């Protein structure tokens, strides 16, 4: 897959990014280089390789799954402009 100048300008327009002609030409080369690298990565044989979440072997810390209300409701609504008990009051926006 390769990117042409029209594609770069179209993507920039969709992203609402102002790109000059010189920048678009430079980005065309950069994006084609990136896509070439991604194509190289997709050709690597990874059969038998376990997926990793980190480059360092580690085990995630686990904690007990305990249901609790956190006892923070009053603190959470303390700075709200309007509240009733432990609920936020907001103006009606849909008729």
UniProtKB/Swiss-Prot annotation:
- What InterPro entries does the record point to? Asp/Glu-ADT_sf_sub_c, GatC
What Gene3D superfamilies does this protein map onto? Glu-tRNAGln amidotransferase C subunit, N-terminal domain
**GO annotation, biological process:** glutaminyl-tRNAGln biosynthesis via transamidation; regulation of translational fidelity; translation
Q: Which cysteine residues pair off into disulfide bonds?
A: none
Keywords of the record, alphabetical order, are:
ATP-binding, Ligase, Nucleotide-binding, Protein biosynthesis
**Any idea which GO molecular function terms this record carries?**
asparaginyl-tRNA synthase (glutamine-hydrolyzing) activity; ATP binding; glutaminyl-tRNA synthase (glutamine-hydrolyzing) activity
UniProt enzyme class: ligase
E.C. designation(s): 6.3.5.-
Q: Which reaction does it catalyse?
A: L-glutamyl-tRNA(Gln) + L-glutamine + ATP + H2O = L-glutaminyl-tRNA(Gln) + L-glutamate + ADP + phosphate + H(+); L-aspartyl-tRNA(Asn) + L-glutamine + ATP + H2O = L-asparaginyl-tRNA(Asn) + L-glutamate + ADP + phosphate + 2 H(+)
Extract the PANTHER family matched here. GLUTAMYL-TRNA(GLN) AMIDOTRANSFERASE SUBUNIT C, MITOCHONDRIAL (PTHR15004:SF0)
Family the UniProt entry places it in? Belongs to the GatC family.
Matching HAMAP family, A to Z? GatC
Record-linked NCBIfam families: gatC
What is the annotated quaternary arrangement, including any partners? Heterotrimer of A, B and C subunits.
Role noted for this protein = Allows the formation of correctly charged Asn-tRNA(Asn) or Gln-tRNA(Gln) through the transamidation of misacylated Asp-tRNA(Asn) or Glu-tRNA(Gln) in organisms which lack either or both of asparaginyl-tRNA or glutaminyl-tRNA synthetases. The reaction takes place in the presence of glutamine and ATP through an activated phospho-Asp-tRNA(Asn) or phospho-Glu-tRNA(Gln).
This protein's name: Aspartyl/glutamyl-tRNA(Asn/Gln) amidotransferase subunit C
Q: Which organism is it from?
A: Sinorhizobium fredii (strain NBRC 101917 / NGR234)
